[in-house]
């Protein structure tokens, strides 16, 4: 009975407590749950925003966007499963969209290659005419730099040979690296449509950048729709609860990584000191062996057995 009452109190508390920092605060599209809701909300504006975003990022006009389940199982129980932020179909294409804030263990490239192959495998079924096979796209909005050596902020990857000729263009990966977009001018006339989206993701929730965001919205219909959706979903307390929980989990993960790194550094220092001590002792043993050998009372073989070190470590053959 007491347990039921506690759960009831927690539910009431969640509904009555506000997580919104101020009455006009906006959700952050870079938070996983907000990004998903922004493009999958049951409103025509969200659908139009997603359609326009795909058109701008792929570089071709798209229509008839159809949302798909965002979880794909493997063919075998041992296969990795895929869970996407957004999964959708458009004419002749299947698209997975992700927003990613951290490159855990520098393995994001491997994860993405698996995802795009998994999508393609899922939608190409037995007996399908290869002419009907859909192109697969994996689009990632990255809040970290994936490739330091690449200057472009939006990069397109596909299977090509050493001369740049592609095979069939069926597996496609697109990375939008937001840290590279920050340095671009905050002038809509100097930005491409997909760069405008990058600026929107970066500044949509920033109260000091709202004039610029509204300027982007005037010149990009998709961003105009996204601004409308963001304003609407920011009125819903449950969305603030989800975003708050998300940022808490991000902070916890960063703290765990930082703590693990600190422990690793400390352990490394301890191991280094121990290794240095051992090396010092070993060097002293070698010096003693050389003295004994020079004294002539013992043979090199006898010294080696006595001090448990190889002959070559203290005796130079002439």
Regions found by a protein language model. Give the residues of each.
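Accessory alpha/beta interaction modules
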Residues: 1-173, 182-184, 259
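Short, charged alpha-helical interaction segments and adjacent helix-coil junctions
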Residues: 2-26, 91, 95-100, 202-318
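Generic secondary-structure boundary/loop-capping signal
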Residues: 32-36, 74, 116, 127, ...
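Non-catalytic, well-ordered alpha-helical scaffold segments
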Residues: 32-33, 48-51, 110, 136, ...
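Generic structural signal for hydrophobic core residues of well-folded globular domains
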Residues: 38, 42, 57, 179, ...
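Short intrinsically disordered coil segments
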Residues: 153-160, 189-197, 245-247
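An acidic, glycine-/histidine-flanked metal-binding catalytic module
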Residues: 169, 174-218, 224, 229
């Amino acid at each position: 009975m007491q347990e039921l009452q506690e759960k009831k109190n927690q539910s009431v508390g969640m509904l009555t407590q506000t997580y919104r920092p101020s009455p006009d605060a906006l959700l952050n599209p870079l938070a996983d749950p907000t990004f998903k809701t922004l493009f999958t909300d049951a409103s025509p504006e969200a659908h139009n925003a997603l359609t326009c975003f795909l058109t701008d990022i792929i570089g071709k006009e798209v229509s008839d966007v159809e949302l798909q389940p965002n979880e794909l199982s493997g063919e075998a129980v041992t296969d990795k499963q895929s869970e996407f932020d957004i999964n959708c179909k458009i004419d002749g294409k299947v698209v997975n969209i992700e927003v990613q804030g951290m490159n855990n263990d520098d393995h994001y490239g491997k994860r993405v290659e698996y995802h795009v192959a998994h999508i393609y495998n899922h939608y190409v079924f037995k007996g399908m005419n290869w002419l009907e096979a859909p192109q697969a796209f994996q689009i990632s909005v990255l809040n970290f730099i994936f490739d330091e050596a690449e200057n472009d902020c939006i990069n397109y990857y596909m299977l090509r040979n050493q001369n740049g000729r592609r095979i069939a263009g069926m597996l496609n990966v697109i990375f939008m690296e937001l840290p590279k977009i920050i340095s671009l001018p905050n002038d809509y006339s100097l930005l491409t449509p997909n760069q405008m989206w990058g600026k929107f993701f970066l500044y949509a929730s920033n109260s000091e950048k709202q004039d610029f965001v509204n300027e982007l919205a005037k010149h990009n219909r998709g961003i105009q729709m996204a601004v409308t959706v963001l304003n609407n979903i920011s009125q819903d307390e449950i969305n603030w609860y989800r975003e708050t929980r998300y940022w808490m989990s991000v902070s916890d993960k960063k703290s765990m990584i930082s703590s693990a790194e600190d422990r690793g550094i400390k352990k490394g220092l301890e191991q280094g000191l121990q290794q240095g001590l051992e090396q010092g002792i070993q060097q002293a043993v070698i010096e003693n062996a050389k003295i004994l050998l020079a004294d002539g009372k013992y043979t090199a073989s006898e010294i080696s057995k006595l001090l448990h070190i190889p002959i070559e470590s203290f005796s130079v053959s002439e």
